[in-house]
Amino acid sequence: MSRRQPFRYVLLLIALLTPGLISGCATPSRISAVPSEFTAQAQPSIPNARFFPDRNDPQLIAEAVRSLEKERAWLKAGGHTGPLPPAVFLTISGGGGDGAFGAGLLSGWSETGKRPNFKLVTGISTGALIAPFAFLGPEYDPILYETYTQTTDRDIFKRRNLMAAIFNDALADTAPMAKLVDRYITRTLLDAIAIEYAKGRLLMVGTTNLDSREPVYWNMGAIASSKDPAALDLFRKVTLASAAIPGAFPPVMIDVTVDGVRHQEMHVDGGTTRQVFMYPPTLNLGRTSKALGATRQRSVYIIRNARLDPDWASVDRRTLTIVNRAVSSLIQTQGFGDLNRMYLTATRDGVDYNLAFIPRDFTVKKTSEFDVNYMRPLFERGRALAIAGYPWSKYPPGYDPADAAEVP
């Protein structure tokens, strides 16, 4: 979710001004939601397709173990007999058009010849659009360049008229973005992801289940590897859902079953519950690795597609301006919390922490969310920083290791 989306919270004003109209008119229909007592049992048609990080999900731990077993088997087949090689994780945050920064950084990193082959790649919102191509490597950088230097608002959404916005499920129609996703997310792409998944590499995308109000991590490698006819559609739906800003963009309805009974879950932008994620602290990677004899060097590279310094502005005394500014502040603060949680988890587990973000001196202004006159220079800035050797921050914003050392 970006900090600059001027129409994002118009829905709130509509709800305040027209309660009688809204309550008296039909809304889009849906299949019944999963009853609260069965949410943990609900499954899409593809096994092992997702995890619930806030529930200490044992399936997530089991997937980590399987990943290690597959990696060891692949290394052995290739003649590797020494210790496990370093594991490098990549996490890509939300940010709308600001995703051009991350796309440029990855492209520049490729040009240096030093970009790692990531063991784990995760993405939220715009990061979910980048993640599959980052996972597959530099060969797919041209897609990132095209997407984040040529895409405009009309390639992502169409604004609905006022009445449609009031009585439908969002202010805008994301049919254009669905076409973009269909263009790039193909069966061929899934086959390439499946090959890497078989080597023990993991690709995860985050959404938010709005019915149960919890984050969901989707195991995109397992989905890609599935022979289920619905695999391609589910992969596309998850990608679209991760970027579905609540109120602005329509939610994505995902079919699940409980004891053979069909239900639907409403999924929206993963940034509603996480701006960026690595793995849940409950996994305790350090302890698990020791138990499995899998001690190795690990590092995480976090791309936060946002500025981290205060974005000063003189706020007009207008309802929508105030709402937008306040909620943008909440999103920024949530992002800080995510970065701190990841730092604490990484420190506990012996994972080297590295953070990139849009620099303070990038001052180009945008006129819309996907403004190519903003995204192109942002892409080039990220690329140039990577080529020069990005100065990765070793700590989250506001953290002073000297102060931490003084705590008794």
Annotate each predicted stretch with a short phrase:
Residues 21-24:
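C-terminal motif of bacterial Sec signal peptides marking the signal peptidase cleavage site
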Residues 26-119, 135-408:
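Patatin-like phospholipase
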Residues 96, 124-125:
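Catalytic nucleophile serine of serine hydrolases
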Residues 130-133:
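Hydrolases whose catalytic domains are alpha/beta-hydrolase-1, hotdog thioesterase
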